[in-house]
Amino acid sequence: VCGAVHHAKVSRTVDARTRREALQRKVGAGLSEDEFFKLVDQGRIGHVGLVESAALCALGLGLDCDDYEEELTPVFAEEEITGGAFTVKKGQVAGMHQVAVALDDGQERVRLELTIALGADEPGDVIELDADPKIKVVIPGGIPGDRATAHLVVNAAPRMTASEPGLLTVLE
């Protein structure tokens, strides 16, 4: 539906109040800023694999990338937030904002942004392609991750059973 893609941006915003307690804790809800960054340093906060997803996205779009960067920052509660597994007081961490970028010679080619926080505004998924023509897809509310994973497995099963032995990626 389009020509060559020059840049891709994917944004996902999730209101963690609608998700299981384990995810709420994984994004740092209820922590202080210091506690949040301590767990970041230990690799215990954030979405695992976002940089790898950026690399896979670049590969699938035919973009040559030679460097990848990632940033993880807290989202703070601007007011007390109730709902979910616990109450988050104003000023505490409500969740996280994580960004992964794929670069080609210093130029950003793919940007993935993930915000998961209690009370996050306007949950949803947005996909934007800088191509000819430009494409923007908005999914209000977003696609629930657990359900999407189950659908991916079911839809991949016929191709997996018909494939040759060996390691495959989602691109194959």
Give the location of each predicted region.
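C-terminal helical cap and adjacent loop that interface with cofactors, partners, or active-site loops
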Residues: 118-172
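Active-site-lining helix/loop region of Rossmann-like oxidoreductase modules
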Residues: 2-125, 136, 150, 155
